[in-house]
Amino acid sequence: MLTITSYFGFLLAALTITSALFIGLSKIRLI
């Protein structure tokens, strides 16, 4: 149970970081 929770937490964090970087690059490219 703990392993699954940690896995999903890591996956969510990775997804958040990826989208944040993508949005940042998009804004820079937009400017």
UniProtKB/Swiss-Prot annotation:
Membrane topology type: Single-pass membrane protein
Q: Name one GO molecular function term.
A: electron transporter, transferring electrons within cytochrome b6/f complex of photosystem II activity
Q: Does the keyword Phosphoprotein apply?
A: no
One GO term under biological process is: photosynthesis
GO terms under cellular component: chloroplast thylakoid membrane; cytochrome b6f complex
Transmembrane segment boundaries: 4-24
Any idea which UniProt keywords this protein has? Answer: Chloroplast, Electron transport, Membrane, Photosynthesis, Plastid, Thylakoid, Transmembrane, Transmembrane helix, Transport
Does this UniProt record's set of keywords contain Phosphoprotein? no
Q: Where in the cell is it found?
A: Plastid, Chloroplast thylakoid membrane
Consequence of gene disruption: Cells have no visible phenotype or growth retardation effect under light intensities ranging from 4 to 400 umol quanta/m2/s.
Function of the protein: Component of the cytochrome b6-f complex, which mediates electron transfer between photosystem II (PSII) and photosystem I (PSI), cyclic electron flow around PSI, and state transitions. PetL is important for photoautotrophic growth as well as for electron transfer efficiency and stability of the cytochrome b6-f complex. Seems not to be required for photosynthesis.
Q: Give the record's subunit note.
A: The 4 large subunits of the cytochrome b6-f complex are cytochrome b6, subunit IV (17 kDa polypeptide, PetD), cytochrome f and the Rieske protein, while the 4 small subunits are PetG, PetL, PetM and PetN. The complex functions as a dimer.
State the family it belongs to.
Belongs to the PetL family.
Q: Report what the protein is called.
A: Cytochrome b6-f complex subunit 6
